[in-house]
Amino acid sequence: MKRETPLDRYRNIGIMAHIDAGKTTTTERILCYTGKSHKIGEVHDGAATMDWMEQEQERGITITSAATTAFWRENRVNIIDTPGHVDFTIEVERSLRVLDGAIAVFDSVAGVEPQSETVWRQADKYKVPRMCFVNKMDRIGADFYRCVDMIIDRLGAVPLVINLPIGSESDYAGVIDLIKMKAVIWHSEDLGAHFDYVDIPAEYAEKAAEYREKLLETAVEMDDAAMEAYLEGVEPDEETLKKCIRKGTIAMKFVPVLNGSSFKNKGVQPMLDAVVDFLPSPLDVPAIHGLIPETHEDVIRGCSDDEPFSALAFKIMNDPFVGSLTFARVYSGTVESGSYVQNTVKDKRERIGRMLLMHANNREEIKWAGAGDIVAIVGLKDTTTGDTLSDTIKPVILERMEFPEPVIEVAVEPKTKADVEKMGMALARLAAEDPSFRVASDSESGQTVIKGMGELHLEILVDRMKREFKVECSVGAPQVAYRETISKVFTVDYVHKKQSGGSGQFAKVSITFSPLPPGSGYQFESKIVGGSVPKEYIPGVEKGLKSAIDTGVIAGFPVTDMKASLIDGGYHDVDSSVLAFEIAARAAFREGLPKAGPKLLEPIMKVEVVTPEDYMGDVIGDLNSRRGNILGMDQRGNARVIGAMVPLANMFGYVNTLRSMSQGRAQYTMHFDHYSEVPNNVSEEIRAKMAG
């Protein structure tokens, strides 16, 4: 089948920002001006096209990244709308993995906020070229130039200003295009669909000339011929200038910065032009690397329809009409509905049922997809987030995404008998959609425990169970996911024998437990030489230890940052078995760990509080009382920003305390930073609580 749009006219982009910077409204306007959305949906009245889950419309924040396709100047723009709330950074990470470029949206009043920094760092990790859109220029306190300074100070980026605002706050009238050196004024009567190029107002001429010079000086560095001509006093023409800006943006030398007000319908079209002119197509980004499953050889798959098929599943969503939808980015080759592909991570064949092109909440069925496409596939049985789908004859595994460990857990109990079965199914579905959400059952109490990235994260998942799956459940108080580790090296010898007539059990093990640096997790190695423990019994030792580390010796929390080395052992020709070695390893763990200096670890959160000066003393005092360690204070506009490291255990309900302390004027964000040792007095309290 022939492609409708050539690959160099594709743009796979994400819109990323802090909560409330106006990301969903911006996406809405893009869909409106590209002819994909006929009525402008406002987040203000809970009707945005991209926010299609009920809770999103109610809370006015975006939770799931809906993928949608729009067309602009004969280019096909696939947009992934990403959530800006810190509890959903996993969604952002997931969508950045499959994008070629991104638009960072900033609030012109607040500037670069904490979550913007987090997302920016994630985009750096995946080497995603990006541009910035300074939004909400019509708000009181809007300051475009301060925002540009913050992009330098906070993000360490090189901003390249492409257009300047004309006026600000209620006087915001339009922008000055520094490439064309014209002013752009929008018509308000047709919701900003049309605009005029006019001469730059006299009072802005000097500012425009200054920024035009900065633009030229930075951009021409990307092209030797343009640079030489510029040094001789010849300015590049519009096309050459755009080429230079594009080259530098894709090479991540600088980030183009534009401004506008999506809500007031100003500045969106120049931003779309910039997406097409400056952000990369699938052909401009490096080809994807993968491994051949059997040989683990490195292989490169270029972005072309002629290469073998490969795609990455980056999101699973449950749709009320068609069931489970798998969103996938096709990196190479083509695929047709009805064909078979290989899930190389699970080693299972999957049949591609129907394929859909999504537009926020309506869809178009397609029969064929090629390299560069982002599609939703119906009917995949075994595929979860992060899996690779590939050609059955030439399989490949693309690099997997890494997902953070959950830091908070709550117990959930179904309210009625009928809810028991439904809850199991609902939780399984939600866990398949979201890899940072885990479900476990507590072996002692028999309760179902759900784990996630924050209070809001779990609250929304419980809410979805109620709405989508009609499951009523009661939720316990949030619990902290503590861990245990050891502080010194200890070797334990253990003999397990059981003789009671008939065949007995015998296993002898010598295991060294040694501490590892923070964040290393648990490791097992066998140092057996000379067959003191036969090869076939070593998996038994590994299995026994693996099951034992889930329950530490201090208060029954999982053990981490520890290495267990099997150094010696003994066996009996008749009585030894894998099971005997499993039991011996478990007992060795129980005996050895208390002597290896066990310690309790707790999750430490990085907290940033933005508060008016008047409440600063109260906020700092309160953070100190929560065992917080103040990292520093900054001035942001007329507010103070306090950075601190605080144990998660002391942060429950903080939002209400902060609200009442500052009369609702202070805000905070927090995300997991690291695990740290619990002080002795607190450790004793936790032990007593667990024992009681």
UniProtKB/Swiss-Prot annotation:
Annotated Gene Ontology cellular component terms: cytoplasm
CDD domains the record matches: EF-G (cd01886), EFG_III (cd16262), EFG_mtEFG1_IV (cd01434), EFG_mtEFG_C (cd03713), EFG_mtEFG_II (cd04088)
GO terms under biological process: ribosome disassembly
Main location: cytoplasm
Residues at which GTP binds: 17-24, 81-85, 135-138
Keywords assigned by UniProt, alphabetized: Cytoplasm, Elongation factor, GTP-binding, Nucleotide-binding, Protein biosynthesis
Domain tr-type G, chain residue ranges per copy: 8-283
Keyword Ribosomal protein: no
GO terms of molecular function: GTP binding; GTPase activity; translation elongation factor activity
Subcellular location: Cytoplasm
Free-text function comment from the UniProt entry: Catalyzes the GTP-dependent ribosomal translocation step during translation elongation. During this step, the ribosome changes from the pre-translocational (PRE) to the post-translocational (POST) state as the newly formed A-site-bound peptidyl-tRNA and P-site-bound deacylated tRNA move to the P and E sites, respectively. Catalyzes the coordinated movement of the two tRNA molecules, the mRNA and conformational changes in the ribosome.
Family assignment from sequence similarity: Belongs to the TRAFAC class translation factor GTPase superfamily. Classic translation factor GTPase family. EF-G/EF-2 subfamily.
Protein name from the UniProt record: Elongation factor G
Name of the coding gene: fusA
